[in-house]
Amino acid sequence: MPDAVLTFGCHLPTFGPIATRGNVLAFARKMEALGYESLWASDHVVLPYTIKSKYPYNPTGQFPLPPTAAFLEPLTTLALVAGVTERAQLGTTILVLPHRHPVLAAKMLATLDHLAEGRVILGVGVGWMREEIEILGGNYDRRGAWSDEAIRIMRVCWSQERARYGGEFFSFDEIGVVPQPPRKAIPIWVGGHTPRALRRVAELGDGWHAAFTPPDVFAGDIARLRAECEKVNRRFDDLAITLRVGLSFRDTPGGADRKPLQGTPEQIVADIGRYRELGVGSFLLEARYRDLDDMVAIFERFAREIRPAVTPSPRRT
């Protein structure tokens, strides 16, 4: 799908010392003005002091933040951002489904989408941290089936005037969940790369929201996702293929251990081209920064040097 229009989003400053009201608002305004199409927030409700679960996105398996770090709740944060933006879509990367009752989550998301006039994208996942899920009352070992049901429930709440559902984990009869989203739906991008996650994308997702996956691994995942789509008679081309990836600039080329989109401008352009050939249509960029000024400077440089090289002009809606 290399001829499709590329879109680029930015991760908001939602964790660590830069996670302040002023920084979130200033960053959101600036990124929309630069032409970025979407703004994103991650999800952790609590950070236990002892985490035995393996973090899946770095070689050490250690979660990179201490339990004393601020971590803004994503839907609350996006509601704030909705009030100071007009065009940018607002997304979760990802909302951990077992953290919230699905009817409550449906209500919160519908309210956000109502106030944002239809700009919400729901990135979802089942979560990796057993400790956090169990603290919040979830069953870690059943979280996959539970999350599948949660997705179905949210769609029922968003589309039916008298919502009703009967399943293994939840059952309710004729409830009103108003307001509903302006589109009677919110796009759901399913995260994960395990066989079950890719099956969930094919069965229940509007898109796949991959994270930090190098191109060679990504190519294999795409092949497996195509196979899952065939099993359920789903058109692969109907899925949005999206990727969350780190971003940093270097003055000299990195070596063999260089991570994608972390290198010289020429390397970053080449990385984007390779992902684009594999079908990625939307990138969520997460800057590797020292402070907020550094974070903003990275995104300014990307808009100035990289974007013109990979797409004719920022797409504004």
Label for each model-derived stretch:
Residues 1-317:
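Active-site-adjacent structural elements that line small-molecule/cofactor binding pockets in enzymes
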